[in-house]
Amino acid sequence: MAVVPGGPSSRPAVGAQFFCTAGRGLEPFLMREVRERLAATQVEYISGKVFFTTCSDLNMLKQLKSAERLFLLIKKQLPFPVSSVSKGKILNELQRLINDDPESWLNAISIWKNLLELDAKKEKLSHKNANPLKRKVGEDDITAKKLKTEQIQELQETKECQLEKQIEEKILEQGNFITEGEKFQKLQDDVTEAVDTRNQTNLTFRVSCRCSGAVAKTLTAQEVGRVIGIALMKQFGWKADLRNPNLEIFIHLSDVYSVLGIPVFRVPLACRAYIKTAGLRSTIAWAMASLAEIKAGAVVLDPMCGLGTILLEAAKEWPHVYYVGADVSDSQLSGAYDNLRAAGLRDKIELLQVSVIELPLPSESVDIIISDIPFGKKFKLGKDIKRMLQEMERVLRVGGTIVLLLSEDHHRHLKGGEASSGPLNSQGGHTEEPGGEERLTPAEKAAVSEPVSSPFAASNQGRLDRMPPLGSLVPVDCYRVSLGKTDALISKYKKSHSPGR
């Protein structure tokens, strides 16, 4: 699947094709977001990735909140049949990804160039008109530090490969592909020069690979990267540069698909510049807030706010709201205060040091409650979870919404101690890997086409129907999401009536 050639601007008339990576279970949130925020079309998903077409520029693309990383799509095709062919045959097929369709690569580079050029022009205009005294101090440092952390994590999780030294003997020793002091403007200038059609040989690149499933048993990421890298150098005359390339090529080979793309941003979208100290994953926090139906003028409470990540994400997206964060811990509230100050939201969010089971708020005074209920080895809540929910129920108005992040044990406790539907682990929930909509059942296809992107929630609806309400709190939605080493449930409830009625 080739991207559409770009014109003189960064907004091709028929749109460009992108894909985002997402934490497992967040795909429905991302599908809904790209439709609503980017007016995206041709939206489809596979486990961990959402594909779409949009005419949006970089400024709009940067605003995606439920995505981890954003890529410009070069190709998406069926997987290589590794079980029926030799390793040499597979390596030849890898070379054909470049040699059989070089035009799709040049089209992708053209669109990528146009996106960066227009963004650079807007950035220069913004700096020219801005008062330098009003610039936020420390934001670049925060981004750089977060980028370094994200790079280390990504290298560990995806076993990202570097092109080996055999590709080009004169390549500098492998290191981080971006240094903390590197300026994005220099990259844009280099790219503008390098991707000029008369100067293609000046373009430098590196290849990042990920292999999973049966492919990983046959090929290593290093082998794939070497073959792709050599093919690109021979086809286009590009030069490999592991430390500071103009361009990065990402390739993921699995049992379900083969995907190639170009990272649009060097800093992952999930790495928020406005969050000084990370607590809950920002994408999870935003997804929870997006379920809460926040409207202007509402009172929103996080009674166990920790470092305030949920409130930060909500306040950035829905600013005209009164936010209250509560926590019993001095250190957590101190971290939350630092985060609010760094994000410029100190006047938007009020912090209270109180216990979740003794909230100093009148009954039915809160419109929305969003909270990450602590769990794990450090937190043993047991039956206290029901006491907490009763206090939340008390302060919530009738018709109000509660969105909670729950462990399997907490979720089972709230269901009245019913047996779990199965162990909650990294393979639980809706983790099938359909190769786009062509692998979905008719019912799932209909669900995916809905504006709210509900195929994941639909798979849990049977369990929701059997769940007894906790007092006046009636379950509405339930999404199983990955937190890395473990999974959790984003559960949404509505208050149907006042207790005692």
Curated annotation (Swiss-Prot):
Keywords: Methyltransferase, Nucleus, RNA-binding, Transferase. The keyword Isomerase does not apply. This is U6 snRNA (guanine-N(2))-methyltransferase THUMPD2. Belongs to the methyltransferase superfamily. PANTHER family: THUMP DOMAIN-CONTAINING, THUMP DOMAIN-CONTAINING PROTEIN 2. CDD domains: AdoMet_MTases, THUMP_AdoMetMT. It catalyses: guanosine in U6 snRNA + S-adenosyl-L-methionine = N(2)-methylguanosine in U6 snRNA + S-adenosyl-L-homocysteine + H(+). PROSITE patterns: THUMP. It is an enzyme of class 2 (transferase). Residues 149-264 form the THUMP domain. Part of the heterodimeric THUMPD2-TRM112 methyltransferase complex; this complex forms an active tRNA methyltransferase, where TRMT112 acts as an activator of the catalytic subunit THUMPD2. Residues 430-442 have a biased composition (Basic and acidic residues). It is found in: Nucleus. It comes from Bos taurus (Bovine). One of its GO terms (cellular component) is nucleus. Its EC number is 2.1.1.-. One of its GO terms (biological process) is tRNA methylation.
